[in-house]
Regions:
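Transmembrane-helix bundle segments that line or gate the permeation/cavity pathway
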Residues: 1, 7-31, 47, 51-65, ...
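Perimembrane loop-to-helix junctions flanking transmembrane segments
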Residues: 2-4, 34-40
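Alpha-helical transmembrane segments and their helix-start/interface "positive-inside/aromatic belt" motifs
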Residues: 2-9, 111, 130-131
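Broad hydrophobic/π-residue packing in well-ordered secondary structure
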Residues: 24-26, 32-33, 95-96, 112
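Generic, ordered loop/turn and secondary-structure boundary motif
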Residues: 27, 37-40, 44
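Long, contiguous internal "core" modules enriched in hydrophobic/ aromatic residues
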Residues: 40-42, 50-183
Length: 183
């Protein structure tokens, strides 16, 4: 009924907002449709295809839930797998950027998938899976920061190199992010 409509509407709304937001990463958002043509070499293109496929796979399930049709859930399982694929392709957009050593490693997909599983469990009110997901997420974040720090140091990165100011001397933070103590 209407509860299913609201939940599916929320999911579809967030997915569409995410796709629209992603189109602003492009140099010219009017050319967003061209992003679909590079699926053989571009993780961004694969993400676009995966997201559209996921939305299309889940549309019959959403319609069945909303109208109480009781259609078989097989397509829903395929849609769930497609959701994982979409989040994985999104993570690979970041993981393949060699210029950012903290991202250019295996921990990025692990972190994204942990966020996905934990968020899904929380939104669906699944207490034990949400707790397990939070623990997995903590482990994934710890691994990400540990591996990222090593990768950053291995490449000899510094604040000066990151800002391009290393040719002038040692770079430092001009002003701290806040001026009063934390609570």
């Amino acid at each position: 009924g209407w509860i299913a409509f609201l939940w599916w509407g929320l999911g579809y709304g967030l997915a569409v907002i995410g796709l629209l937001a992603a189109s602003f990463h492009l140099g010219n958002p009017k050319n967003a449709l061209k992003a679909f043509s590079q699926w053989r070499t571009s993780w961004l293109s694969r993400e676009a295809w995966a997201a559209v496929l996921t939305l299309l796979l889940l549309a019959p399930v959403a319609l069945s839930d909303w109208l109480g049709l009781g259609w078989p859930r097989v397509i829903g399982f395929a849609g769930a797998v497609a959701c994982f694929g979409t989040v994985f392709t999104t993570s690979m957009i970041y993981a393949q950027i060699a210029a950012v050593p903290r991202w250019n490693n295996w921990t990025v997909p692990a972190m994204f998938l942990s966020f996905e599983l934990t968020g899904g469990a929380l939104l669906s009110g699944q207490t034990l899976p949400a707790l397990i997901g939070c623990l997995a997420l903590i482990a994934a974040l710890y691994a990400h920061y540990t591996v990222g720090d090593v990768a950053f140091a291995k490449r000899g990165q510094t604040l000066g190199k990151a800002t391009g100011l290393d040719i002038v001397g040692a770079a430092s933070v001009f002003e701290q992010p806040h001026t009063s103590p934390n609570y």
